[in-house]
Amino acid sequence: MITAIVLAGGVGKRMGMEIPKQFVMVNEKPIIIYTLESFDRHPKIDQVVVVCKQGWADTMWGYIREFGIKKVKWVISGGSIVQKSINNAVQFLSDKCVEDDIVVIHDGIRPLVDEHVLSDVIVKCQEYGNAVTSLPYNEQIFIKETEKTTNKYIDRNTLRRVSTPQAYKYEVLHDAYDEAISQNIGMVDSAYTNTMMVDLGHTLYFAAGSDKNIKLTTTDDLALFKAYLREKEL
């Protein structure tokens, strides 16, 4: 069984929107539906749980029904930070997944996730027990000496950009969150499952990424998403 956790608990402050950004309409369709359609189409995804901003579950279910999304089985409430939202879903799945099941975690505001990226993260997880979507880092990275100066850089060949989707065997994921919460490791606002896993001593395995798999955080990101959609129509 392969279950996807899709996170849809954002508020959209950086976009200056009055509604959560995952519900912003693009071509008469909310952003979250573009994301869910990718999971609905993928032959290896069996079921989806959406972690939703509190108070928006009815809206989410309304769109799921309107656009014919079949694989979403549950919509649950998120937490105050993304790590608590993921943990809510992991705990919710405790009587719905067995130890060797694969759980794919994805940001709901990455609507351009494609079949190749999803397939590779699943295949790598089946082989190694986990997998994180990644890409080479193509910019130069400098370390601040002061707020105005630098005299050191990091060799970009030693770096990878990691995003979502990420995939983990359920038992390992569940045990990791239990350990992280009990020891207060990797549960801060800037953390995610991948950073928590490394903090707990796990080795992670890279899977294929895509430059199109952007996270819609700003209005510039939204404009880029619309441009990609226009490109697909050509």
Curated annotation (Swiss-Prot):
Keyword Acyltransferase: no
Residues that coordinate or bind CTP: 7-10, 79-85
Assigned EC number: 2.7.7.40
SUPFAM superfamilies: Nucleotide-diphospho-sugar transferases
Keywords associated with the record: Cell wall biogenesis/degradation, Nucleotidyltransferase, Teichoic acid biosynthesis, Transferase
Gene Ontology cellular-component annotations: cytosol
Site for Positions ribitol 5-phosphate for the nucleophilic attack, residues: 156, 215
Signal peptide boundaries: none
UniProt KW Nucleotidyltransferase keyword: yes
One term of GO molecular function: D-ribitol-5-phosphate cytidylyltransferase activity
GO BP: cell wall organization; poly(ribitol phosphate) teichoic acid biosynthetic process
Residues the UniProt record annotates as site (Transition state stabilizer): 14, 21
Role according to the record: Catalyzes the transfer of the cytidylyl group of CTP to D-ribitol 5-phosphate.
HAMAP family linked to this entry: TarI
Family note: Belongs to the IspD/TarI cytidylyltransferase family. TarI subfamily.
Name assigned to this protein: Ribitol-5-phosphate cytidylyltransferase
Organism this protein belongs to: Lacticaseibacillus paracasei (strain ATCC 334 / BCRC 17002 / CCUG 31169 / CIP 107868 / KCTC 3260 / NRRL B-441)
Lineage: Bacteria, Bacillati, Bacillota, Bacilli, Lactobacillales
